[in-house]
Each structure stands twice: as structure tokens, then as C-alpha cells.
Amino acid sequence: EFRRVLFRSQYFEMKDLVNKTGAYIAKLLDVEGATVVSCASAGIAQSVAAVLVKDSDWLLENLHVTPIENNEIVLPKGHNVNFGAPVGTMVALGGGRLVEAGYANECSAGQLAAAITPRTAAILYIKSHHCVQKSMLNVAHAAAVAKSHNLPLIVDAAAEEDLQAYYRAGADLVIYSGAKAIEGPTSGLVIGKTQYVEWVKRQSNGIGRAMKVGKEGILGLTCAIEHYLTASKESGEEMVAKMTPFIQQLNTLDGVTARVVWDSAGRDIARAEIKFDEAVTGVNTGDLVNALKQGEYAIYFRGYKANEGIIEADVRSVNAQQLEIVSRRIAEVLNKEKNA
């Protein structure tokens, strides 16, 4: 039904479309409620606004000019990251004030609870590879803390693949990107408890108006979720098999060491870690990464450790033939720079 209308010129009553697609997605995922938003970042901002505004018509229209005593959003310090924009900016857009719990290298359930005050409105948990992973409480632990303090737990799971795990772990609102693991259009998905999702939907007449999602995004994401739930998914072991010849080719290059590494956030994703001994290659890794973007094929890597001479290749969206092109291109750039 949703697929057929995508390719026609149709008019929609947007509130009705939001409600019906949300109910349909919620049924697909076996959750209480769901709604499509413009992106995961908008989902964070609107979720924060939702737990502050709730049913207040006044706050809906005057969120940023009305003092709100209970506006603190508690977040593990190691989750206060920049994912392309600061998490704190999204919280502030939603009217919240960020309060960090624990330390940059650890946050236990006790440390999270210690940051809660009478001014706390919600707990925010960021499930992302950008965040510190070691010595951090998991979503279930955060949910237990939230429940014991009668607070909602908001989980940003933008790039996560499991569309049910964090809801089942006790989160009240969970936010996903429509364009990452789901591979849909630029959009976001918010699922959760009925009351909280309804409060998020109210934000279409508040801050959400500036983050409005169109019918194309709503229907496109709905179709993408349908497909995502039924399509076969490449396992980590299949990724390893695909990248093994690629790694072997790279290990024949002087000063290059490649190996399989697994996703630091715990997902079933295998990647190729490529380490360059710059004393041997004579090439700065940052310069190499930039050069690889400039060829006939623009090749991009995960470059979070490029300053250490390490990059990672995510092979989920490429095939074996394309990996051959990548390894050949790396060899070409290294030889060119070394002989320059």
C-alpha cells in the first residue's frame, strides 16, 4: 500500500499520514509507538523538548523564553561527543541543559544516579562508536537507574542495526537514523512508549516545525523499514571472508600492516584496519587519506586514528572487485609519493 503511493502524485493530510505510518511501523517493530522525523539529530532535539513540554500548550510555543526549573538532561560524560554536531547543541535546541555524569573514561550506574537532582528531566544515552566504550554502563543499566528515579530514558541509536533491542532493554524513547543501517532516505525514526511518542509528535507545532519531514521522507522510510526487516543481512563472518584477499594484498606492501578488527560498539561488523609505518612508507597517513579521495574513484576511510597512522575500511557497501581497486589505489599512491 505504501509502495504504490510513492510513485504517484498524491495529496496527504500530514497529521493523518504521520499517525498512520507511525502505527504501521510500531506494529512492524512490535513497539508501543513510532513516528518519523527529519533525521536522528532532530529526533534528539524533539525528544528532549517532548519530555520538557509534555502536554503544555504554553511551553510548546514558548519553550526558549520560559524558565523551566526541571530541564536537566543527564548524560554519561563519555557520551558527550560531536557526531558532526555536538550532542549538547541538540539538547539545547530541545530546551534542555546537559549535565555530565561520571568521567571521560567511566560511568557506572551509581555515577549516573549521583548526577540526578530534583531538576533532572531525563537521562540521555548515546549508543555510538563515537563514544567511550570501556567502563561504561549499558542501556539496561541506564534504564534501571531511570526507572528507579521515575525518569524517562532517551537512547540515541542513530547508526544501530537492531530496531528493537534498546526499547526492549527499557528505553522510553529510541532514535534511529533512516539513512544509516536502514538505508532509507534522509530521515529519522523515534520509537518508544505511547505517551512519550505522542509528546514527540506534538513538537511538529513547536521546535519540530523547523525540522519538518515531508511525505517523501515518511513514506520512503516506511518502505525502507519494510525492506530492512525482511532483507538478508551480511554477517560479520561474511565480511571477513570478503575482505581477506584485500587484507592479504595490503600486507604485501612495504610498511603496511592490515588485519581484521571488530566494531568497538559491539555490533556484528568486521572492518579492515590498515596501519602505516610512516618511517618505511615515507608518506604521512593524513596526506594518503586525502590523496585517495582525489582519484578517479573517491575512496573514503574511517580516519579517526589517522594521526596514529591507522585507518579502517568498512566493507559493508563494497564488493570484492571494488576492494581490489582500493588496494591497487593505495599501492599507487604510496609508490607515487615515495618516488616524488
List each model region and its residues.
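Conserved PLP-enzyme active-site core in the AAT-like
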Residues: 1, 19-229, 233, 247-251, ...
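Short, small-residue-biased leader/transition segments that mark boundaries at the very start
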Residues: 2-6
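Conserved PLP-dependent catalytic core of the aminotransferase class-I/II
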Residues: 229-262
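Conserved C-terminal alpha-helix-loop-beta "cap" of PLP-dependent enzymes
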Residues: 251-331
